[in-house]
Amino acid sequence: MASPTSTNPAHAHFESFLQAQLCQDVLSSFQELCGALGLEPGGGLPQYHKIKDQLNYWSAKSLWTKLDKRAGQPVYQQGRACTSTKCLVVGAGPCGLRVAVELALLGARVVLVEKRTKFSRHNVLHLWPFTIHDLRALGAKKFYGRFCTGTLDHISIRQLQLLLLKVALLLGVEIHWGVTFTGLQPPPRKGSGWRAQLQPNPPAQLANYEFDVLISAAGGKFVPEGFKVREMRGKLAIGITANFVNGRTVEETQVPEISGVARIYNQSFFQSLLKATGIDLENIVYYKDDTHYFVMTAKKQCLLRLGVLRQDWPDTNRLLGSANVVPEALQRFTRAAADFATHGKLGKLEFAQDAHGQPDVSAFDFTSMMRAESSARVQEKHGARLLLGLVGDCLVEPFWPLGTGVARGFLAAFDAAWMVKRWAEGAESLEVLAERESLYQLLSQTSPENMHRNVAQYGLDPATRYPNLNLRAVTPNQVRDLYDVLAKEPVQRNNDKTDTGMPATGSAGTQEELLRWCQEQTAGYPGVHVSDLSSSWADGLALCALVYRLQPGLLEPSELQGLGALEATAWALKVAENELGITPVVSAQAVVAGSDPLGLIAYLSHFHSAFKSMAHSPGPVSQASPGTSSAVLFLSKLQRTLQRSRAKENAEDAGGKKLRLEMEAETPSTEVPPDPEPGVPLTPPSQHQEAGAGDLCALCGEHLYVLERLCVNGHFFHRSCFRCHTCEATLWPGGYEQHPGDGHFYCLQHLPQTDHKAEGSDRGPESPELPTPSENSMPPGLSTPTASQEGAGPVPDPSQPTRRQIRLSSPERQRLSSLNLTPDPEMEPPPKPPRSCSALARHALESSFVGWGLPVQSPQALVAMEKEEKESPFSSEEEEEDVPLDSDVEQALQTFAKTSGTMNNYPTWRRTLLRRAKEEEMKRFCKAQTIQRRLNEIEAALRELEAEGVKLELALRRQSSSPEQQKKLWVGQLLQLVDKKNSLVAEEAELMITVQELNLEEKQWQLDQELRGYMNREENLKTAADRQAEDQVLRKLVDLVNQRDALIRFQEERRLSELALGTGAQG
């Protein structure tokens, strides 16, 4: 409040303005402040200078200092950069207010219209470092004292709007409430300007306001006429937000926030949630702000089962409509999930009230996200030009789990204001549009990691924010259709509704091109003459020659002479799948019989897509080209390795064989997927035989078209049928397992425990390697293929396994959290195994401190960290408050500090380490959600491709009387679809490899914590069971380190192969 000795009423009004927490209170207190100073609100930047000059008040000086520093940046030219520009901003959301502030600082006249009359959204927004610095520079701590005082950086939408509203009012933005923008009113004649169509009954001054810049920030449901919008669809995704009353009690402040938990890497949490409450979620986030804010993604079947949804409807609007949602059940659902996630420490959860006085909980659909194809346009009529720009949700709808909405929204606001500045400087219209579109291309790729590190230098100029900026990435000629002279018909642009992934670059194109490539690859092999894409492959020799050509050493052509056609073809299909990553879409029977020519063409086109860059000269090559199949191949081998690890863990838990301290080095070569266990056939034998093993789905028994075929363990499925037997969730590559007892497929969360006593020795710990072709199962005269050139060697003898100990260096550990893993090229020889369990434990723990996303800190590193804290722009008077820690985190930090001897010497490192741990946790969560979203988009794109493929295949099979040219055209189109599908499947495999990396990282963190608990106990107090459990945890930890090392080596091998390929192409 104002000073007790102050007699100036303006001081009291200013204090009321600072402390106001309701929109109407902000407006009324500012009106009273201006009245006390003899000013009229909305006078532009000159108004700010008048308020500052007349309000000589100690409490305002720190705010004036901050705003003067911002306004004094050279880019604003002392508020004269856009003095002749008149702007209309639609929408008082965070992005609309932020762009209004920037335009006001440039000196433009800014009028903002908002249809609402109050701010009531409690939902919380995640803040990037630059947004924190940006808001602090605008006086955020002055307006909102609790701004970013916790371990997670966030702010509620309502508080952010209030903060920016106060800044906009001080800078002279003219704001009109309860006014709805309905469209543009073009100038009726020369000499007049553009106006807005507004409702209801706007004041005459506003109705007659003519402007030359319109910035739309009115949300995703309103995009001005002329802008094209693209829809990016995934599978059904239902989000739930809930706000509970924050009583700010001591108990509530001690409950740690949850930056994000995702099923994709922490399935145990959601399995426990399901068992305890019956609630099935994909992810959950908890932020503590004005309210206790929870947001989660729920599964539809769970909502139906628990009565939250009355009825299942295919239309999402009807499914989540108010008539189909039971409010009381939704409240029980969210309360139970929130209570479980916080271990019941929040006490009795009471819902906050929304704008309508109802409990603030809602379910929403984010299956599809809208994105404008362009960010700006120019319209001209009667010589009057209007620049239109988009910011906020009407530009790009954010994907809420990533927390990118406000950060990228602010970046778009800065870019839009920069565009207006260039417009005001007199730059050519097409040049302004081209620069804006060049910046827009960067927006969706922007993250804190790929922007400039020094956030203090960020400003309106894009060069201060984006490294390696190219403002000419889009040329003026490419944006001519964005300049619309209304006397002409506007140019219509293609509006694709679905992102189907990468284009079909390098596809086979036509049958003739595919046949020519196959002839080049198989030329010179004895007994092989390829003249067509059907009968030439019936004896299996051509297919074996193709496999040998692409990966020498897998099949020796001389050993194939005299084999049966079916045996040779089946063997080639298996080897191609296990060693080249070429998943079959046609059965061996169909190839030999020639009954599925389209399937064979699709299969051969996969070879072409994966190895199209190989030399055309006949004869073997030393190394296979890194094609799209490499990720599929590695994921397949990684999945088999993880399945063996889970089998060994289950055997250990059941009291199996004695375990080894060292991880067996995995050298997979010619592993063949195990045959399904007898007992429960996936399809009736008669149907299976009749279909030739490829025409019918092994689950539903319906017909399979070429584009629909998904091959798993030798069986073909519809992708839509291949779901978890328990929860019916989509099974992603690397994320499922077939139960040997019932033959069904399960996601890892619902995989039943195996009864090892009943399994026999085939799958027990005595058989760590999957079966390889034996003399009885191999064709006569055909030996086991030799090691592939990708590093696989002969299958080791289980009785004499190859063993090695792996130590990860600090750079390698840091690169584990990145998608581009590049380990050191020179690796030290493996150290000798430690002699004792304690020594091995210390070695494993010193190798990685992934629980906090940091390597073990040396005293020198902590000194640097301490210095960074003191010099950080977030410190000084606006430093974050320290927060209580939960017991587990406190124990881990204290243990680490005691062993490092740093607890007393460096008082700020504890808070810094905790904050960085939360940041790493948030990064992992965001990475997981990005992957999940892209997987959903790929699934939707594959469904569309399959539908198109079915139509083409039906046309080819039924229209026998169609002209030959038409058939060739259809086949060419089918090949393009197959190539697109292969590209999407390869991208899917890449994403799932990253999922496995996240899984291993999460498991290693958990094992780290568990092992530390055992190590911290006094040795004389440990029981035999404790020592046995410690040994078991240690072995699991070493196993995980080796598996993560395999991921590093795979990424490095791919990087080197691609680099070599690129160098060869340039040469």
Swiss-Prot record:
Zn(2+) 2 binds at C724, C727, C747, H750. Disulfide bonds: none annotated. Its EC number is 1.14.13.225, 1.6.3.1. Keywords: Actin-binding, Coiled coil, Cytoplasm, Cytoskeleton, Endosome, FAD, Flavoprotein, LIM domain, Membrane, Metal-binding, Monooxygenase, NADP, Oxidoreductase, Phosphoprotein, Zinc. Residues 695-757 form the LIM zinc-binding domain. Interacts with STK38 and STK38L. Interacts with RAB1B, RAB8A, RAB10, RAB13, RAB15 and RAB35 (in their GTP-bound forms); binding to RAB1B is of low affinity compared to other Rab proteins; at least in case of RAB8A and RAB10 can bind 2 molecules of the Rab proteins simultaneously; ternary complex formation of RAB8A, RAB13 and MICAL1 is possible. Associates with the SH3 domain of NEDD9. Interacts with VIM and PLXNA3. Interacts with GRAF1/ARHGAP26, GRAF2/ARHGAP10, RAB8A, RAB8B and RAB10; may bind simultaneously to GRAFs and Rabs and connects GRAFs to Rabs. Does not interact with RAB1 and RAB11A. Belongs to the Mical family. This is [F-actin]-monooxygenase MICAL1. It comes from Homo sapiens (Human).
